[in-house]
Swiss-Prot record:
Residues 15-36 have a biased composition (Basic and acidic residues). This is Ribosome biogenesis protein BOP1 homolog. One of its GO terms (molecular function) is ribonucleoprotein complex binding. Residues 1-36 are annotated as: Disordered. One of its GO terms (biological process) is maturation of 5.8S rRNA from tricistronic rRNA transcript (SSU-rRNA, 5.8S rRNA, LSU-rRNA).
Length: 671
């Protein structure tokens, strides 16, 4: 049955614009629209967040650019189109951009986009910080001042001043229950204490009373205090092994020698024997004897406690001054004087000005050298090898005494220097009365051209002048009684002051101010008074073989060099024994020289060194003489017969040292 009804209004849905509902417009009670401001929602951080990949202008993706090095493009964009490579700039464009663009220095090339990116000030500052080793963050200070909140200031009030709770002052009920249970267990006998350990019986100490110091007397305490342990037995050596090496076993000759020797003379008190195994070694038959001798040694041999002084070795060395404070002394090799062939055995310097140097060598020549230039200005050919030369100490005479092999001594006129002095020397040689000598004289004088020649009975080792220049002495090489002769030039006479042999004479020298003669044998030096012909003093040198001798300017000190490598300083006013004995050389000392003006002393040796000493001699008896080594000089080479430096002398006015060598050279050392 159809019924009629009124049509109900159908509610239609409002169309959405752009798929969104239109917001309702708020109205008031009268139906008028209200002016409502929209509420701004907080922005979502993911709406504006973007990664580095999304910010790239070249959206080819995060792929290596080198994949497209051989292609004409650098990738594809989001639409699939090829992205062409940007055109490369030429050198001219790059140069123009560098000149015209003021921001060129802050641009970098970005491989991802293929373009130049301009760096900001913040980025540049970060780069500078990284390059200089600083933190990249701008303005970051890693050393901020530490703010000590609690201990920087002294507080008078506590930080937490809450009062103690009341429960702290009330006894604990739990503890009360525990104590009551323990008391009840003790009353009932349930609580048991720790078990007592059974004491084990102790061993009786037999020596307890010996160790106790209660009943020890004072004498026993003193003996205990100074007790010295017995020396230990020496450890066995290889020879005492049951299987020693073959070199420790005796052969027939050594066995016979050991059996024939006395017990005290034997190096070993047993004969080494060899066994293959330790089980084959028999019982030692001398065991009880050695133990008994050991007991006798401990019982009879007294022991002595030696107090050792623990001192630093450097404290025992004397304090040496700075060598720079002791200058001048020779330090540098100035030049060599070459001309001799073979050994240069002797040299002598003109004693007043030191302008001339005379040298004699194994080649039989005597050469005169200019000291300033080292040039040889004159040469004398002798009839034998020259052994000694000596300039006359008189200033106005150009005399030179030369000893050479063939048993001759010659007095030469060097012919060098002042012409007036040369003429006076020629006149002196011509006026020497060689014809007035007695018949049968041991030493004969004769004139030969411009020189005097003395025929000696033996080969001459050395010639030396007296300070006044009229007397000179000669020493023979042979060990005979008449080995020393004193010659007087003004009378052309020679005499032997010693008729008895006192030893093998090695060197002689005159006292510089008195009529005395020093004669050096191998181990002694004797001082003779020539005026009274008596022995003044005999000196004990301590050398085993004296080789050279020299005196100071006053004749109060004597300097000796020996073939036993020793150098001795004899102070004649202190006694007959050396004041100083030094052993700075490793070979024989050949010559000693003392400077006339400076406190300098020199020794030369076969080890190829010349030792220079600072030798100060005081006239004040309250001061001791000073001797300090200051320099070691080297200039000559050692020959096959182990000879090197043979002679030395000082320049009379300068601190210059002249040395001769077996290599045929003459060396001059200056400061």
């Amino acid at each position: 049955m159809a019924s009629t009804s009124t049509a109900l209004p159908v509610r239609t849905k409002r169309k959405l614009e752009n798929g969104k509902k239109k917001p309702k417009t708020p109205k008031d009670e009268f139906g008028e629209k209200l002016d409502v401001k929209p509420v701004i929602k907080p922005a979502d951080e993911y709406d504006y967040d973007s990664s580095d990949e999304e910010d790239l202008r070249n959206t080819i993706g995060n792929i290596p650019i080198q994949w497209y090095d051989d292609e004409d493009h650098i990738g594809y964009d989001k639409f699939g189109e090829k992205i062409a490579k940007p055109a490369k700039k030429g050198e001219i464009e790059t140069f123009l951009e560098k000149m015209e663009d003021p921001d060129y220095w802050r641009k970098v090339f970005d491989k991802q986009t293929g373009t130049d990116v301009k760096l900001t000030d913040e980025q540049i500052e970060k780069i500078h910080n990284i390059a200089s080793g600083k933190y990249p963050t701008i303005g970051y200070n890693p050393y901020e001042p530490f703010l000590d909140i609690y201990s920087s200031q002294k507080e008078i009030h506590p930080i937490d001043n809450r009062p103690e709770p009341k429960a702290r002052f009330i006894p604990s009920k739990d503890e009360m229950r525990m104590v009551s249970r323990m008391v009840h267990a003790i009353k009932m006998g349930w609580a048991k204490g720790p078990k007592n350990k059974k004491e084990e019986p102790k061993a009786y100490d037999l020596w307890a009373s010996e160790d106790a110091l209660d009943n020890v007397t004072k004498s026993q305490l003193s003996r205990m205090r100074v007790h010295m342990p017995a020396p230990k037995v020496a450890l066995p050596t290889h020879a005492e092994s049951y299987n020693p090496p073959e070199e420790y076993l005796f052969d027939d000759e050594e066995r016979k020698k050991w059996e024939e020797a006395e017990k005290e003379d034997r190096v070993l008190n047993f004969m080494p024997s060899k066994y293959d195994a330790l089980r084959k070694v028999p019982q030692y038959d001398k065991f009880i004897t050695e133990r008994f001798e050991r007991c006798l040694d401990l019982y009879l041999a007294p022991r002595q406690r030696k107090m050792r002084i623990h001192a630093d070795p450097t404290d025992l060395l004397p304090d040496l001054p700075n060598p720079n404070d002791l200058r001048p002394f020779p330090t540098t090799l100035a030049f060599y004087m070459r001309g001799h062939t073979g050994q240069v055995r002797a040299i002598s310097v003109e004693p007043v000005h030191g302008e001339l140097l005379a040298s004699g060598g194994e080649d039989g020549t005597v050469r005169i050298w200019m000291m300033a230039t080292g040039r040889c200005i004159k040469t004398f050919q002798m009839d034998g090898e020259v052994t000694s030369v000596a300039f006359s100490p008189v200033a106005d005479r150009t005399l030179l005494a030369v000893a050479y092999e063939g048993k001759y001594v010659a007095i030469l006129n060097t012919g060098c220097g002042d012409r007036l002095h040369v003429q006076q020397t020629e006149t002196l040689l011509a006026e020497t009365p060689t014809e007035s000598q007695e018949d049968g004289a041991i030493v004969t004088w004769r004139k030969s051209k411009d020189k005097l020649v003395l025929k000696m009975p033996n080969e001459v080792r050395q010639v030396t002048w007296h300070a006044k220049g009229d007397y000179f002495a000669s020493v023979a090489i042979d060990d005979i009684a008449k080995s020393v002769y004193v010659h007087q030039m003004s009378k052309a006479k020679s005499q032997c002051p010693f008729q008895k042999r006192k030893g093998h004479v090695q060197a002689v020298t005159f006292h510089p101010t008195q009529a005395r003669l020093f004669v050096a044998t191998k181990i002694h030096v004797r001082e003779y008074d020539l005026a009274r012909c008596v022995l003044v003093k005999k000196l004990i040198t301590g050398c085993k073989h004296i080789s050279s001798m020299a005196t100071d300017a006053n004749g109060e000190n004597l300097f000796l060099g020996g073939l036993d490598r020793r150098f001795c300083w004899m102070d004649l006013q202190m006694g007959n024994k050396p004041w100083k004995k030094l052993k700075h050389h490793t070979a024989a000392v050949r010559s000693v020289a003392y400077h006339k003006k400076y406190p300098l002393l020199a020794t030369v040796s076969d080890d190829g060194t010349a030792m220079v000493y600072y030798a100060r001699i005081y006239s004040d008896f309250s001061k001791d003489n000073e001797l300090y080594p200051v320099k070691r000089l080297r200039a000559h080479e050692r020959t096959s017969n182990d000879l090197c430096m043979l002679h030395t002398t000082w320049h009379p006015t300068q601190p210059w040292l002249i040395t001769t060598g077996a290599d045929g050279t003459i060396a001059l050392f200056t400061y």
